[in-house]
UniProtKB/Swiss-Prot annotation:
This is Phosphatidylserine decarboxylase proenzyme. It comes from Chromohalobacter salexigens (strain ATCC BAA-138 / DSM 3043 / CIP 106854 / NCIMB 13768 / 1H11). Is synthesized initially as an inactive proenzyme. Formation of the active enzyme involves a self-maturation process in which the active site pyruvoyl group is generated from an internal serine residue via an autocatalytic post-translational modification. Two non-identical subunits are generated from the proenzyme in this reaction, and the pyruvate is formed at the N-terminus of the alpha chain, which is derived from the carboxyl end of the proenzyme. It comes from the Bacteria. It is found in: Cell membrane. InterPro entries: PS_Dcarbxylase, PSD-B, PSD_type1_pro. It is an enzyme of class 4 (lyase). The gene is psd.
Length: 280
């Protein structure tokens, strides 16, 4: 008797041989196109396909955007996302996982874990402040607002680009690609905060053409090398202010030290808005 095919597993396995970066660069070029008919068609098709709510956008007219990426990274109205108390969600999305960091282990999906040390770029000293701390993973779906904000006020200490693959990020790959978030290309941003150390990890994914930060712009590191930038002059970003954005896709993993406790309302799969209170 034939064993039924697990479609999620098949979807994940099909991605291994794909030229992830080549595909992402190609999509990125299309997303930057300023050809009116092409960008207007792409934006309107995207809005229909993913049921994007434009009523909260600062610019609600799809044709007003110069290119698809400008639409995708659209700003919201100033009153669209009130900022709650304590530690807040850095983005709109789904709280896919949260909880304790057990020594070097974080939960990726039910029954699947990955390494804190690997996530942060393979430096044990960098990972040490977060051992036995806590973490939260927010997945941004295509229809979500794609700017990333500070969950608390923080002083930027270090930025680390970590090269990697660009598997798509969703429940199928979380369940079937071991160490997904520590395997994909990512940007690790380390902050000092009143709640202790904070690592904001912006994880790339298939067709994520670029990651930007407010202090460095688009991050374009040397290919294939871990690149570390330390900041001697303080860069302070207030709670609720933008710290970065995805030009298409992906996921934010927050790692904290020992002084953060999640609120009772938090559950795996909770849909959250940027600014929504998650922890104290």
């Amino acid at each position: 008797m034939d064993t039924p095919v697990d479609r999620d597993e098949l979807f994940a396995r099909m991605q291994y041989p794909l030229p992830h970066h080549l595909i992402s660069r190609g999509v990125g070029k299309l997303a930057e196109s300023r050809t009116p008919w092409l960008k207007d068609w792409a934006i309107r098709r995207f809005i229909r396909t993913f049921d994007v709510d434009m009523s909260q956008a600062l610019e609600s007219d799809p044709e007003a955007y110069a290119c698809f990426n400008d639409f995708f990274t659209r700003a919201l109205r100033a009153d669209a996302r009130p900022i709650g108390e304590g530690v807040v969600s850095p983005a709109d999305g789904t709280l896919s996982q949260f909880g304790a960091i057990r020594q070097d282990t974080l939960v990726q999906a039910k029954g699947h874990t990955y390494s804190l040390n690997a996530l942060l770029g393979g430096d044990a000293a960098r990972a040490a402040p977060f051992r036995e701390g806590s973490f939260a993973t927010v997945y941004l779906s295509p229809r979500d607002y794609h700017r990333v904000h500070m969950p608390v006020t923080g002083t930027l200490r270090e930025m680390v680009y970590v090269p990697g693959r660009l598997f798509s990020v969703n429940q199928a790959t979380a369940n079937h690609v071991p160490g997904l978030f520590a395997r994909n290309e990512r940007l690790v941003c380390l902050f000092d905060t009143e709640h202790g150390p904070l690592a904001m990890v912006l994880v790339g994914a298939m067709i994520v053409a670029a990651i930007e930060t407010v202090w460095a712009g688009q991050v374009t590191p040397l290919s294939g090398r871990v690149q570390t930038t330390r900041f001697d002059e303080p860069i302070v970003i207030e709670k609720g202010q933008e710290m970065g954005r995805f030009k298409l896709g992906s996921t934010v993993v927050m790692c904290f030290g020992h002084d953060v406790a999640f609120r009772d309302v938090c559950t795996d799969g909770l849909v959250v808005n940027m600014g929504q209170s998650l922890a104290s």
